[in-house]
């Protein structure tokens, strides 16, 4: 089975289903043994984001750890799709006055598969993963330390972004 990229998520097309919008999962909990449960957002087969809970070692830099886990991609058994292009590295992350400034390597742009829906999932996965933390209300995405207008030519990311709950759906493969 090949790896699934952000662009592949949307080839099947998505459909707007009334009543399927769920509240964002805001659950950062102690998992015991010095671990923490965080929520990561990945693409699903319908072209929306779906939450995947992941247990990580408790760390003071939990937002940094969450971004590194997001870059790793979803677990194989989740049936979800990676939203961050392969080869992308987290350069830096800072949180100040409710704003998370997250800086990625050039690969997030240069290796992005493109498409407005794929770009939306990439941005949404970053923003929604970071805004689960109570200290983060907005997210500014940088590439190699610079503010950029867009990742793949469709969506403006030159200004801080807020949580995007409208693109979160439960995993269609679960009941």
Which residue stretches match the model-derived regions?
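Bimodal "functional hotspot" detector
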Residues: 1-175
